Regions:
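Acidic, proline/glycine-enriched N-terminal capping motif
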Residues: 1-131
Length: 131
């Protein structure tokens, strides 16, 4: 089985690495900031219409292409984006949300292929295929 879709949006620049550390009863904890909660909600809302009827159960390759807008920059369509955030951190957050929505049973099944680009049409392209 293979699923692919494009979510038009300006991709987020916050990742799980941007959690805030707090101390509660002498113990350190990481909590989502209001901004990170908004990013997760935005991604969840865009992912929800694409959840498969049944989750993938075996290994899957998840290709994610994060495309930031070229408008107002000196970058050209298709140029690799080599600035933060890290593609690995973006894909970790994406896969955690996809697991919670029911794309697959556990994100340990995922063989990630994240890429970052500048694009005339911003958004996130996702392809999921059974291996």
């Amino acid at each position: 089985m293979r699923i692919e879709f494009f979510m038009p949006m300006v991709p987020p620049t916050l990742t799980f690495q941007d959690r805030q550390s707090i101390v509660v009863k002498g113990r350190g904890m990481l909590v989502d900031t209001p901004e990170l909660k908004a990013v997760k909600a935005k991604l969840r809302d865009h992912l929800a219409p694409h959840v498969p009827a049944t989750p993938f159960t075996g290994p899957v390759r998840v290709i994610s292409k994060w495309c930031w807008p070229t408008e107002g920059t000196d970058h050209v369509n298709g140029e690799y984006r080599i600035t933060k955030p890290d593609a690995d951190n973006l894909s970790k957050m994406l896969h955690d949300l996809m697991e919670k929505l029911g794309f697959f049973e556990n994100d340990s099944q995922v063989m990630p292929v994240p890429e970052k680009f500048w694009a005339d049409v911003p958004g996130i392209y996702i392809a999921i295929e059974e291996l």
